[in-house]
Amino acid sequence: MKIPYARLEKGSLLVASPDINQGVFARSVILLCEHSLNGSFGLILNKTLGFEISDDIFTFEKVSNHNIRFCMGGPLQANQMMLLHSCSEIPEQTLEICPSVYLGGDLPFLQEIASSESGPEINLCFGYSGWQAGQLEKEFLSNDWFLAPGNKDYVFYSEPEDLWALVLKDLGGKYASLSTVPDNLLLN
């Protein structure tokens, strides 16, 4: 019998249980960026913004990197932008979340990697998801979230609309069967 992944730590993925069926966290996959006794924060990987980014927000002379994704990182501070990237030349102000996935960077760094045609993968996340001390543990113990190991393929190369089902399938067992649960159980 395969033992389920149970590491609530930086770099883990939080996969919403099908029981979370409303709101921003419904079928969400969150990359846990920090987890400590003081609380936790992460970025939703599979929710788009639902609107186009205006030129007023993203005003770079030249954007040649086609590996840029705009995501809704979570419901908190939606006007704050966080940068996930795969750049191996890490500026000082970045943090490795899991292998080849980094959080952080300043505006000159973003401009540089956005203007490079062969630039790294970039997820620009607006807002974040946060939990107070002990809150995420309680939600996990209540089976609101499943855990999976994070990796760059999930973060950068998976289609956002397929990510929730993909991670559950990859977990196997009972999780794989949950990946086929329809959004609306009345349609089942």
Curated annotation (Swiss-Prot):
InterPro entries: AlgH-like. Disulfide bonds: none annotated. Gene3D superfamilies: VC0467-like. GO terms for cellular component: cytosol. SUPFAM superfamilies: VC0467-like. Belongs to the UPF0301 (AlgH) family. This is UPF0301 protein CPn_0139/CP_0633/CPj0139/CpB0140. It comes from Chlamydia pneumoniae.
